Curated annotation (Swiss-Prot):
Assigned EC number: 1.1.1.34
InterPro entries (UniProt xref): HMG_CoA_Rdtase (IPR002202), HMG_CoA_Rdtase_cat_sf (IPR023074), HMG_CoA_Rdtase_CS (IPR023076), HMG_CoA_Rdtase_eu_arc (IPR004554), HMG_CoA_Rdtase_N (IPR023282), HMG_CoA_Rdtase_NAD(P)-bd_sf (IPR009023), HMG_CoA_Rdtase_sub-bd_dom_sf (IPR009029)
PANTHER family, per database record: 3-HYDROXY-3-METHYLGLUTARYL-COENZYME A REDUCTASE, 3-HYDROXY-3-METHYLGLUTARYL-COENZYME A REDUCTASE 1
Residues carrying a glycan: 575
Pathway: Metabolic intermediate biosynthesis; (R)-mevalonate biosynthesis; (R)-mevalonate from acetyl-CoA: step 3/3
Active site positions, chain numbering: 265 (charge relay system), 397 (charge relay system), 473 (charge relay system), 571 (proton donor)
Protein name from the UniProt record: 3-hydroxy-3-methylglutaryl-coenzyme A reductase 3
Similarity-based family: Belongs to the HMG-CoA reductase family.
Molecular function as annotated in GO: hydroxymethylglutaryl-CoA reductase (NADPH) activity
Amino acid sequence: MDEVRRRPPKHIVRKDHDGEVLNSFSHGHHLPPLKPSDYSLPLSLYLANALVFSLFFSVAYFLLHRWREKIRKSTPLHIVTFPEIAALICLVASVIYLLGFFGIGFVHSFSRASTDSWDVEEYDDDNIIIKEDTRPTGACAAPSLDCSLSLPTKIHAPIVSTTTTSTLSDDDEQIIKSVVSGSIPSYSLESKLGNCKRAALIRRETLQRMSGRSLEGLPLDGFDYESILGQCCEMAIGYVQIPVGIAGPLLLDGKEYTVPMATTEGCLVASANRGCKAIYASGGATSVLLRDGMTRAPVVRFPTAKRAADLKFFMEDPDNFDTIAVVFNKSSRFARLQSVQCAIAGKNLYMRFSCSTGDAMGMNMVSKAVQNVIDYLQNDFPDMDVIGLTGNFCADKKAAAVNWIEGRGKSVVCEAIIKEEVVKKVLKTNVAALVELNMIKNLTGSAVAGSLGGFNAHASNMVTAVYIATGQDPAQNVESSHCITMMEAVNDGKDLHISVSMPSIELGTVGGGTQLASQSACLNLLGVKGASKDSPGSNSRLLATIVAGSVLAGELSLMSAIAAGQLVNSHMKYNRSAKDVSKITF
């Protein structure tokens, strides 16, 4: 049967001819409708109100006029005449009358609002859903019942099933009350209950009750909350769904890859797919890994700048590198110190450690190793004050020249030669137009904008989509999207040479979100799931080249769309929803 909306029965108090109170409900008994004349006031009351209003404004004007005259003549205000006393009495009386007539009704409106179920917001029509009345018409034989009530038709979108109190046990209700009162911290539910999903359910219901906001549409079931405990997310109340599309095959270094992309931007996957098609038809792309090293830069302070310089010379002395490396490398069997770069700002010294981290992205690994070195240095430099384990010279999750120049994570360059016929048939443009557009837009335009590492069309689109799909840290899209796109005509101007240089791709295939089921499946699709047993670090390096190849495909397709004047048309076709969201309610 169709679902319809019905308001809760409104309790009505009625009296019979003998004055006894009769209780009934509006669903079963209908009082005679009130006539408009029932709401009108007696004529005498209208006249009284008009008289009081006139009196109020008259005496108020009189008193203000007298007050002004006294100020002008420097007469003391406390000296009053009989007319002024009478005017004051009339003013007070009229105010009392007006407050009694209008104020009581205003106050009563609040008291009625607390008991009238039709006026309070807690009776949300969206939450009061019942099935259509299926009682036989014979139930309407009693003359006191009116069964001609027409029920409104449900016109809202289907309501997503959410957690209701019926799914909560008595123990859950007690815990919810304790969390609301503050006797049980919300963050401790997992440890107290020993069940991560139950903790998320209780925290979610508590949040809805305390905020008065519904979490409809935010899924709770179908997720392994044990897998995120202590490593991915705290205070869980559900999970967000992001669609995953595939682009490819991407022919890179002689192998084909189907690239998973998690995004909500229409046309992005389609554009990347077209770029992959053009690369495939032209014989594929090649990539080179230039560097692989994660960085961390603690900051320490000394009493004088000279002492800071002493430590700088010590750290950069090749004779001391092996000693420092032994202390650094003992933190992990994968961490291997590569270099130390120092910078001084007054009495402050910033030491940028760079090391290989295997298949992990490596931030935790390098941080632990740096802490070991700091502890070791304090033996020889007791006047060293450690300000912080990270001093932003790393630089993590920030656009910084040091990453653009020195690199961070994986530094990759990827290139391809796109044949002339492919440019015309697949990309719908020509080589000369692409070369000119790249020079004016990606190089000159970015320079005019003062861009730092942003000499590209939309590298961050591809990086972020692949990062979310494979369980990387999306915040590291900032420096991982540093990219310069180069295009030039080759083979007598017939073919197009395109390349992307990305100095700081930060990712891993173990740790963090890579172990989640969905993200692990996407890594498995690319053949880089987990750590490589044969060659530690090879899986993460391969993933970095795939990211660069995906960026190459995305740059090629978007630049072609802009050169051919297809950008607006493609986004109007694939990136606009025809759904009227204003008509969807929850």
